[in-house]
Amino acid sequence: MSGRRGKIINPRTRGAVRNVGFRNLISDPFAISSILIGLISWVITLGGCISVQVNEDFPRFTWWGIAFQFLIILMLIGFYIYDLVDYYRNFLTASIGVAFVYSTNSANYLIYGSGNQKAAASAGVVLLSMVNLIWIFYYGGDNASPINRWVDSFSLNGIRPSPFEAAKIKAYRRSSKQTQFRGSSVKLTHSTNNLHSASENLGLDNGFYNNPHTSNYVSSTALTEFENTGPPYPSASDLPTNNNAPLRSPQLGNNTIGDTYITATTNNNTNTTMGDTMGLYADLADESFPYRVKALYSYEADSADAYEMSFEQGEILMVSDIEGRWWKAKKESGETGIIPSNYVTIIDNDTEA
């Protein structure tokens, strides 16, 4: 895939094996620019502090702050190369917070001093403090936050997945499944009552239902047997001599079908039996795209991938399943394809687009 803004090209977004390499760092403009500024600020601070120590006493604790800041920069480079930033966001936020305290404390000592050496050192620690504050704001926020999404939209690796958003989607999916299950149970109960009424009208024995008025469910075995209760074609000895007379079905065990006729259009089942049975399963499969999502960003499908689908920012799509990082979606025009999950957000059915 080409490297357009906001385009997902890193295999990690498809759940593939983690991509390790220096490219992870240089393809992220925020990471490479902030780390370079941090390194330049660190070099200025180190040079200024060395020159200050030559001429006068220098706080020893400041040296530890400078060393700690260098460790933070090295860890950031390593985490980006091995694509581990999302796994250590909390650690990075806490560590950079400590480095921010060190740098601001050193700035408080150096900025009010006199001399060119202290001026250079104070400029370095002030720049480090600013970089640390930006890092705290970025790594302390979730990937789904507006600022993080905007920053990550410039990255060639695409927008990073959000653990918070993934947990929210799973909770929403779980509640939606429970709602659909309750709705299916009501439909199943209604269809079961219809099947029972049909069996009474046909003179069937109530062997499948112990108490149809109090039982809300019917076993799959009972449904299977009921679907197959249509009589087989009668033998020649069962055929009436009058060609105009209707064909009456033979007895099935102890069940006698009194007024059910075999016709060429019933496919060995009566119209009543087939209609009720097919209606039962048709209700359960009405919605193949039950979730509504709204596009947060525009997305251009890769021409080399026939399964991807393009969409515009703010467009409303229907989604069949919300598991994984690529979802099958459907447009209002009927076009279907897969879309990246971190480019859309789930909306309620009663929410205005």
From Swiss-Prot:
SUPFAM superfamilies attached to this UniProt entry: SH3-domain
What domain of life does the UniProt record list for this protein's source? Answer: Eukaryota
Task: Name the encoding gene, please.
Answer: SHO1
Domain named SH3: residues: 288-349
Task performed by this protein: Plasma membrane osmosensor that activates the high osmolarity glycerol (HOG) MAPK signaling pathway in response to high osmolarity.
User: Which GO CC terms are listed, alphabetically?
Assistant: plasma membrane
Segments passing through the bilayer: 30-50, 61-81, 91-111, 119-139
Where would you find this protein in the cell? Answer: Cell membrane
The protein depicted here goes by the name High osmolarity signaling protein SHO1
Keywords of the record, alphabetical order, are: Cell membrane, Membrane, SH3 domain, Stress response, Transmembrane, Transmembrane helix
How does this protein assemble? Forms homooligomers.
Q: Name one Pfam family in it.
A: SH3_1
List the ranges whose topology is Extracellular.
Answer: 51-60, 112-118
Signal sequence segment: none
Whether Transcription counts among this entry's keywords is: no
| Originating organism | Candida glabrata (strain ATCC 2001 / BCRC 20586 / JCM 3761 / NBRC 0622 / NRRL Y-65 / CBS 138) (Yeast)
Traced from the root, the source organism's taxonomic lineage reads: Eukaryota, Fungi, Dikarya, Ascomycota, Saccharomycotina
**Cytoplasmic face: residue ranges?**
1-29, 82-90, 140-353
**The keyword NAD appears for this protein:** no
Which InterPro entries does this entry report, sorted A to Z?
SH3-like_dom_sf, SH3_domain, Sho1_SH3
